[in-house]
Amino acid sequence: MPAHLLQDDISSSYTTTTTITAPPSRVLQNGGDKLETMPLYLEDDIRPDIKDDIYDPTYKDKEGPSPKVEYVWRNIILMSLLHLGALYGITLIPTCKFYTWLWGVFYYFVSALGITAGAHRLWSHRSYKARLPLRLFLIIANTMAFQNDVYEWARDHRAHHKFSETHADPHNSRRGFFFSHVGWLLVRKHPAVKEKGSTLDLSDLEAEKLVMFQRRYYKPGLLMMCFILPTLVPWYFWGETFQNSVFVATFLRYAVVLNATWLVNSAAHLFGYRPYDKNISPRENILVSLGAVGEGFHNYHHSFPYDYSASEYRWHINFTTFFIDCMAALGLAYDRKKVSKAAILARIKRTGDGNYKSG
């Protein structure tokens, strides 16, 4: 069956998709209804259970000198060693067994889904709902990715949306490519990040036992799932060298997943078009979407953060949406929230940069 037909079948037959629209207001010259042009943060029909990931245009940085940058030397040393190990791993790729390649790719996609379908679209934005087996899989996959536990990841991401491009944004892209890519992890957080982050409502995360269980046992969990397991499996089961298991299956794979995620914060805030909202920094970046399994449609995502697809086009260069739709077909995901075409077109007409291409 063609992919687009299968997608329609999943969307319509197995579970409901909540369509989000803006209420009609004035009448166009041709007699059609015009969608209300209120700012996103004032719309009434977003998720009733979470609004702390909606951009707040009223927040401005405080005037005055910037605080002194404090380096976290432990992180600097560990990140440097990781990337040196990953570079060495690249040279070892030709010597790896075929199953080690497959293992690395498998681990890459599963851990990436732990971030994209898990920490991001499910727990940060509540853009769909997941039953226990899927939540359990995603919490394990997220631990495999080792990008902070879900609670901390979601807190920082909600702050990133609500206070975007300010000092309260943990990876503020106005501080440059390197800072928004990895530098924000190598220095102490700006005081504004701590101050405004403490005001966010995280009660939904605190009420979820799986999220808090992961947070409680995160250190032993990440050691096992991100480092020990991916190293031991190829070494034990198909006789891969211990060196290749460490530097290719573990260090290189982990570094690639990290940088794919970081490019959403850096490249997708600096390079690309802004067809949905030219007034915000995030861009549409196809290359980022390829590496981050669907997270590169960033101008759309910041315009409509509650859309479970993080894109207008669902499966187009968006493996994460494909995965969520497959889970919906199995009855494990439901209440997927999708913005209506009318609301999208109204936003494009109001704030787009003129580079929108339908389809």
UniProtKB/Swiss-Prot annotation:
Isomerase in keyword set: no
Membrane topology value: Multi-pass membrane protein
E.C. designation(s): 1.14.19.1
GO MF annotation, one: oxidoreductase activity
GO biological process: monounsaturated fatty acid biosynthetic process; positive regulation of cold-induced thermogenesis; response to fatty acid; unsaturated fatty acid biosynthetic process
Binding site for substrate: 75, 148, 155-156, 188-189, 262
The keyword Transcription appears for this protein: no
Positions of Fe cation 2 binding: 160, 269, 298, 302
Catalyses which reaction(s): octadecanoyl-CoA + 2 Fe(II)-[cytochrome b5] + O2 + 2 H(+) = (9Z)-octadecenoyl-CoA + 2 Fe(III)-[cytochrome b5] + 2 H2O; hexadecanoyl-CoA + 2 Fe(II)-[cytochrome b5] + O2 + 2 H(+) = (9Z)-hexadecenoyl-CoA + 2 Fe(III)-[cytochrome b5] + 2 H2O
Cofactor note: Expected to bind 2 Fe(2+) ions per subunit, instead of the Zn(2+) ions seen in the 3D-structure.
CDD domains associated with the record: Delta9-FADS-like
Residue ranges that the UniProt entry lists as topological domain Lumenal: 94-97, 238-241
Official protein name in the record: Stearoyl-CoA desaturase
Organism of origin: Homo sapiens (Human)
Gene: SCD
